[in-house]
């Protein structure tokens, strides 16, 4: 959520920047009319409150003098009714302003390249050389089925499309990947591991920006319920949601920052806008596992924190010896709440291309303002909004895809990366 003062004082400049850099058309006229009316109602409410207070004091004085106070009492009652009506209109208008503000994306950092879509992203660096194969390359689906470890037909029977049943050594490898990632981030990168709910309320989803704009991408547990919004839940699309909201409505000591958290969770996404895309295999699932990285930092530290967090995700790929590239997203490809994002794309031999395996973003104070997450300096005791960052460290299913395809042998066996062998009981090959 953008700073309301920015929208009030620099509305035209913000609208121009959003249109030029994001392709987002801000409804300037509506916002301007709402703000003008808000100012009028604010003054009217304050004047009515002051007049009502003044008349109420006169009642006491008149009563002490033995005068008839009934006319004054009627006047105070009338002022109270007008005040209640003005407050109600002001509250409704402020809610309308907030509802509109919640649909406005974050402003991109000036270092983000201009562009309309992913074709205009900028490659920053590459790591590792894709392996040359002297045999026909199999994709992860064929390899997983050869190892009797990926069963999509069973998942269709149990649930439907875009789900999978993993079995045997493939399931074990999937588990090993998540354990390896957690151990790396907690033991070498100083993240604190957390276990979080997989169901969250709507306030939590508003805090990180999934609501109100992306409600159709979520799995809601009771979408037709008439219960209060506070009792309605949705399955988490990423552990970023519960982890980041741990600081909602909190004031943190600046000396305690950065706060670095990680969690391994299943993630649930309806993929509402992805019909017909990546229908084969594990690339785009309704349910998938991910190890998430979240940092809560001082505002002046967030850009450096983005570089650090991205490096932490890169380390997973490097230790697994998986070729990848780092891409700086352009303005047209960034997420709704991000001010700057790096994507890490891993090499998939069967597709002969790089595919996203991690997205690392600096959200600036966009989420913090929604959550009212602040920090306080010990020296001057003043509070200010924190900055929040998040990234995949990594998506476990896509990492499994990359391991299966990059470590495949001519006979269909899969070599286990060296760093994973301690998690696999010393096993060197699957199949």
Swiss-Prot record:
Superkingdom per UniProt: Bacteria
Keywords on record: Aminoacyl-tRNA synthetase, ATP-binding, Cytoplasm, Ligase, Nucleotide-binding, Protein biosynthesis
EC code: 6.1.1.11
Metabolic or biological pathway: Aminoacyl-tRNA biosynthesis; selenocysteinyl-tRNA(Sec) biosynthesis; L-seryl-tRNA(Sec) from L-serine and tRNA(Sec): step 1/1
Cytoplasm as UniProt keyword: yes
Binding site for ATP: 269-271, 356-359
Record remark: domains: Consists of two distinct domains, a catalytic core and a N-terminal extension that is involved in tRNA binding.
Protein name, entry field: Serine--tRNA ligase
Organism this protein belongs to: Pectobacterium carotovorum subsp. carotovorum (strain PC1)
Gene: serS
